[in-house]
Amino acid sequence: MTFTPKTLSCFVASAAILFGASTSTAANRPAPSARSVGPAQLEMQVLLDRANFSSGEIDGKAGKNSREALAAFQAAHGLASGARSRKALLQALGAGTVKPIVSYTITAKDAAGPFNKTIPEDATEQSKLPGLYYTSVLEELAGKFHSAQALLKRLNPRARFIAGERIRVPNVLGAEQATRAQTGAVKIVVSKKASVLMVYDREGQVIFYAPVTSGSEHDPLPFGNWVITDVVRNPIYNYNPNLFWDADPANAKVKIAAGPNNPVGVVWMGINVPHYGIHGTPEAGEIGHSASHGCVRMTNWDATRVADLVKDGTPVVFEE
């Protein structure tokens, strides 16, 4: 599988249709389906992730999260969405200067665990586990490389995912460090309608973008202006059935140990509304596509990048 700026430009051209390009050339081309998979889509997702415009879980599919991340990147950089702006977009993304797929050797630490055989759905059963660990090396690597497990299998059809094995992975390492370098006076805005979170710098520029899942009919997002009150890495989850409309009231309150498969993922950012916050999730593939119990859920890696940018007192806006 070879990636080139020419290959990527094919996806950009397709995106022009999806964003309403008016050129006759683009209009005559069929848009890729949300389930289409290919090198152009994968490269675009990797480049957007490296630019801090996340499409959530990298899966190589031209779906909703990818299209909207690309549109947000274009808007933030003053780039039109038509086919004529393709060259400028490719340059802004760094196409051709970074290999989207690189080799990685699975380390002994990657394979050491500890791992859970399975993660029970019931909170009481989860509370009996010493940690909400990954269930496999594959799941751990998927989190490390911001990817769907199915993508890693597709890139490495013969891999056993064991220590010492060399595999092909999305080139996203270092994205967290790049985000951390921008820490400063920022503001978070979450749009319920768009299902996205954006971080703005003091000049009003978007410096981070990611899809989210926020609220539901039963647990609406608390619209308004708030602030971050605490940032907790690897949080212990205090499960209280009284806070959930769909919980069995007979269930007891329990503490669920930390870990990437904890219900709130690897980081919790509380706001000055009781029981509400921004957090990670063990279900990266659902982000942007489902509802939540009122809070703002993100992939674990995106939540980590937001946590690197904020501090107590950071303004947070929840809007419709």
Regions found by a protein language model. Name each.
Residues 42, 46, 64-72, 87, ...:
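Solvent-exposed, polar/charged alpha-helical surfaces in well-ordered, non-transmembrane soluble domains
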Residues 127-209:
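Secretory/export targeting leaders with adjacent low-complexity proregions
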